[in-house]
């Protein structure tokens, strides 16, 4: 047998072993970061669409506003089925701009009685995590049931979207009803990047909106500042529950490196007893470790 052919066959045989060892090393590093933290922390990383690393994935994590990404996909599907573009105008009454919730949309248009496009509303939800814009989109596109049903149609199962932002605001315990495992959310992002879910104009709009996200700069994006990496992400932030714990501090996104490597990363932190700053720092530390590992170790 030709020596080069033999070496090639041997390489194919040992490559899975090398890959397993490398991903095991990353998992150990991530476990080291979260050890001793006063919170339930779940992590999922998908490298180049293939190798997967998870930590504490078998738990229901409240998504908080990360579910607005799920909603955006369902809105795109709704628009395609109805023959609507994201330029389609939506009339918004003053009563829909609730005063007791986070809403840059309401702050800009406090009197309501305005018309904005579906795309503008999606920018408010994906860029700024606007709660009123989210519930307006739910109202116009079939509610949480439609979003839940659409995501399930993609083959995603370990999640649930049952309540609106207004319902969560009225009952903090309802936040736990919109949940997901980290890996299921990572799979959704992978689908957005690699599959033709709907028309390219819808798909590009959502990925571009994730890249220009303005929230959570102290989380996944923080250690990537000053690098040439491109990150798109969606954050989620909860209030404190009756025990004084932060219900959810989350970030879910994708990173494209200059060397052509790509990875999806999701970090969900549930019931944190740490400070808000320290909880966000955990996500940043995880992001830094994954970035360093993939950009330098996997050559």
Annotate each language-model stretch with its function:
Residues 1-25:
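Bacterial Sec-dependent N-terminal signal peptides
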Residues 19-62, 239:
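Beta-lactamase-like hydrolase cores
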Residues 23-33, 139-140, 144, 191-219, ...:
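Structured C-terminal helix/loop/strand segments within mature extracytoplasmic catalytic/sensor domains
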Residues 40, 135-197:
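Mid-domain, small-residue-enriched loop/turn segments at the edges of structured enzyme/sensor domains
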Residues 42-46, 54, 70, 91, ...:
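Soluble periplasmic/extracytoplasmic beta-strand elements of cell-envelope proteins
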Residues 62-92, 125, 265:
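Active-site SXXK
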Residues 86-105, 141-142, 209:
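Acidic helix-start/capping segments at beta-turn-to-alpha-helix junctions
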């Amino acid at each position: 047998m030709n020596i080069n052919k033999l070496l090639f066959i041997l390489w194919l045989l040992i490559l899975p072993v090398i890959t397993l060892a490398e991903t095991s090393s990353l998992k150990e590093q991530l476990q080291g970061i979260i050890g001793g933290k006063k919170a339930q922390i779940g992590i999922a990383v998908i490298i180049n669409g293939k190798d997967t690393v998870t930590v504490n994935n078998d738990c229901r994590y409240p998504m908080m506003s990360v579910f607005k990404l799920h909603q955006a996909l369902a809105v795109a599907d709704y628009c395609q089925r109805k023959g609507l573009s994201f330029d389609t105008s939506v009339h918004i009454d003053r009563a829909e701009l609730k005063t007791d919730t986070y809403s840059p949309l309401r702050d800009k248009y406090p009197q309501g009685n305005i018309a904005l496009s579906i795309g503008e509303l999606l920018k408010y939800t994906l860029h700024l995590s606007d709660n009123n814009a989210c519930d307006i989109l739910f109202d116009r596109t079939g509610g949480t049931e439609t979003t839940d049903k659409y995501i399930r149609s993609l083959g995603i199962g370990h999640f649930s979207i049952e309540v609106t932002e207004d319902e969560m605001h009225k009952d903090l315990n309802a936040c736990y009803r919109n949940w997901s495992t980290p890996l299921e959310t990572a799979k959704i992002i992978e689908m957005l990047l690699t599959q033709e879910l709907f028309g390219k104009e819808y798909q590009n709009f959502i990925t571009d909106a994730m890249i220009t996200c303005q929230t959570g700069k102290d989380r996944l994006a923080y250690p990537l500042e000053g690098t040439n990496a491109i990150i798109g992400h969606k954050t989620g932030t909860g209030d404190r529950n009756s025990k004084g714990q932060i219900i959810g501090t989350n970030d879910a996104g994708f990173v494209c490196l200059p060397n052509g490597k790509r990875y999806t990363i999701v970090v969900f932190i549930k019931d944190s007893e740490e400070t808000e700053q320290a909880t966000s720092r955990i996500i940043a530390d995880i992001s830094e470790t994954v970035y360093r590992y993939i950009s330098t170790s996997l050559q």
